[in-house]
């Protein structure tokens, strides 16, 4: 990957807010987290859900919004439908190629411990002499975190305490009730795994964009290889400076757009909220907001190995996406960039489509000497292309 040459350009930028305000373009912290926190408090005050609060407060992140966003497509029927209808397809995270993308993480042992404690108390396990009160207390205070961060004894961990409850080392045999406890843990583990899968699948739909410039468009070959069918597809530039015609849809889209964060660790969901959600226990309004926030942060957090994409994501609730059949109206298309390996028939189809919709088209070509695309790309002269093609056909018929 080539290094971008520094650009020396003086522009006096201003902000409507103080630089300590998250709404300012000069804010040094994670503005998106501050914005989400503000939207949560607003939602609690107004007694509305988090997404509605985000849609109402989209203007507070105006200074952070890019002027354009790019999306790479393979050449197929679904991609062409997005161009024809000026919409984007909202995908389910379970369909993503990267298994770590939008993966929901929680402390499994904490969940199992809460389930087991509730069960043992409900079934009067101490009275039935399955375990003593001291053992129940030890289970309640057992450590469930990462072993690397544990400073105490190994015998205080959840797995060790459960083993002690189920097995008598002196008699070298299983204790009374061990089968019952093992069976309970087995089914709760299945419930935990299915619960997280359900939460990931049934809450939020996602579509992705790249916030890039001309340099990255022509030099970041991974984007073309991964998402544009090995350069046989195309890239669409959307103009965010021109609002969507429907003001409600405009607010919904701008409110749902957020930049991705990159790091080495995933977001860990709250143990109590996950416990209540999986066991169908009603959450308080605040707990639901916090769970929604954690889900949202999980869906915009990716491995640092993907940082070059500079990705933005549109997040919308599943029930909203169903209303639109997952095809959400988006900002006007500013330009289409055609991959350097696109087949001629496909290229001509895009030419016709772009001409009909009055969209600029650029043909990308390989650089002669570098591992990149030509940076000096020109707008395709569609009328001249088809005129020349017709003249050639007429000559061949003579």
Predicted segments, located by residue:
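Partner-binding and oligomerization surfaces adjacent to conserved cores of proteins
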Residues: 2-398
């Amino acid at each position: 990957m080539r290094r971008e040459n520094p650009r020396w350009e003086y522009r006096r930028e201003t902000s409507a807010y103080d630089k300590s305000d998250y709404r300012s373009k000069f804010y040094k912290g994670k503005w998106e987290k501050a914005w989400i926190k503000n939207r949560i408090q607003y939602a609690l005050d107004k007694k509305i859900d988090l997404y509605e609060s985000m849609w109402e407060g989209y203007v507070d992140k105006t200074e952070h919004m890019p002027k354009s966003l790019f999306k790479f497509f393979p050449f197929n029927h679904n991609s062409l439908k997005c161009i024809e209808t000026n919409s984007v397809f909202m995908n389910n995270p379970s369909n993503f190629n990267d298994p770590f993308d939008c993966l929901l993480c929680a402390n499994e042992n904490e969940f199992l411990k809460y389930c087991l404690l509730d069960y043992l108390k409900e079934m009067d396990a101490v009275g039935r002499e399955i375990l003593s009160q001291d053992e129940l207390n030890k289970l309640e205070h057992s450590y469930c975190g990462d072993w690397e961060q544990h400073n105490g004894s190994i015998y205080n961990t959840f797995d060790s305490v459960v083993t002690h409850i189920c097995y008598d080392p002196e008699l070298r045999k299983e204790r009374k009730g061990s089968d019952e406890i093992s069976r309970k843990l087995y089914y709760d583990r299945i419930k935990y795994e299915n619960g997280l899968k359900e939460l990931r699948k049934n809450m939020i739909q996602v579509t992705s964009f790249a916030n890039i410039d001309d340099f990255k468009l022509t030099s970041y070959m991974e984007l073309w290889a991964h998402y544009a069918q090995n350069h046989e597809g195309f890239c669409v530039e959307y103009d965010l400076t021109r609002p969507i015609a429907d003001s409600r849809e405009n607010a919904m889209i701008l409110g749902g757009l957020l930049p991705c964060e990159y790091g080495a660790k995933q977001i860990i969901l709250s143990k109590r909220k996950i416990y209540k959600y999986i066991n169908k226990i009603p959450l308080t309004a605040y707990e639901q907001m916090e769970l929604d926030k954690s889900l949202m942060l999980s869906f915009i957090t990716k491995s640092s190995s993907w940082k070059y994409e500079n990705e933005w994501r549109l997040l919308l609730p599943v029930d909203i996406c169903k209303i639109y059949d997952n095809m959400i109206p988006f900002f006007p298309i500013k330009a289409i960039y055609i991959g350097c390996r696109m087949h001629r028939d496909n290229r001509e189809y895009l030419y016709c489509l772009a001409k009909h919709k009055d969209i600029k088209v650029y043909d990308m070509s390989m650089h002669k000497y570098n591992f990149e695309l030509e940076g000096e790309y020109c707008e395709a002269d569609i009328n001249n292309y088809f005129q020349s093609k017709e003249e050639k056909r007429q000559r061949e018929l003579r």
